[in-house]
């Protein structure tokens, strides 16, 4: 099964912030595509997980790109 992933982090010691956000685009067992998201504090288990099912890989990648843009506006950086 093919999987693409990207990790974003937002670290600011002055604000006591150390967060991560990970996106995965993968094919499901039912021949559809999914965008999986995990987020939380760096060094801890993920506090949140979300899966969005998509009809095509292009749709999943588009949703991932939109999420990356949003996270980067909230001071996350690609790691």
Predicted region positions:
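Mixed-charge, Lys/Arg-enriched low-complexity segments
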Residues: 1, 46-79
């Amino acid at each position: 099964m093919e999987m693409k992933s990207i990790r974003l982090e937002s670290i600011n010691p002055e604000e006591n912030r150390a967060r991560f956000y990970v996106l995965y685009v993968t094919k499901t067992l039912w021949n559809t595509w999914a965008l999986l998201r995990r987020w939380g504090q760096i060094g801890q288990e993920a506090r949140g997980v979300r899966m969005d099912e998509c009809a095509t890989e292009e749709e999943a990648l588009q949703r991932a790109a939109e999420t990356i843009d949003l996270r980067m506006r909230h001071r996350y950086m690609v790691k």
